[in-house]
Amino acid sequence: MSCYDLCPPTSCISRPQPIADSGNEPCVRQCPDSTTVIQPPPVVVTFPGPILSSFPQDSVVGSSGAPIFGGSSLGYGGSSLGYGGLYGYGGSSLGYGGLYGYGGSSLGYGGLYGYGGSSLGYGGLYGYGRSYGSGYCSPYSYRYNRYRRGSCGPC
């Protein structure tokens, strides 16, 4: 690589020697251009793979026939946290009997139309027990009917 000066040449003119040496002229040196090849480093690009999902579903197939002894409406077991069926012989909705059956319904111990307590009580609303209380009769039951047989006490 060769360089050349861009500084002004010294002239052959005689001049007096200065007392202080100072100069205010820039001197620039320019060299020829150089070239180089820069290759980028290899780049690794990762494409995410597909997401495979599965949603297995289980099915239980029953048969028609006699009711089972478990929790369901029309059964003999507990339904909705209870111990009987909606139309059966056990509790429904936190109770111990069926809504139309022989046990408690809705926090009670009998059926709404049956033989036990309904709705916080111990008997049925239209049956042989009591509704909305802790007694043993209801306004429409066989033990308390002020329209037919008198009263067995306030329900």
UniProtKB/Swiss-Prot annotation:
Pfam families: Keratin (PF02422). GO terms for molecular function: structural constituent of cytoskeleton. InterPro entries: Keratin. Keywords: Keratin, Repeat. The keyword Signal does not apply. GO terms for cellular component: intermediate filament. Sequence repeats lie at residues 70-76, 77-89, 90-102, 103-115, 116-128. Belongs to the avian keratin family. The avian keratins (F-ker, S-ker, C-ker and B-ker) are a complex mixture of very similar polypeptides. This is Scale keratin. It comes from Gallus gallus (Chicken).
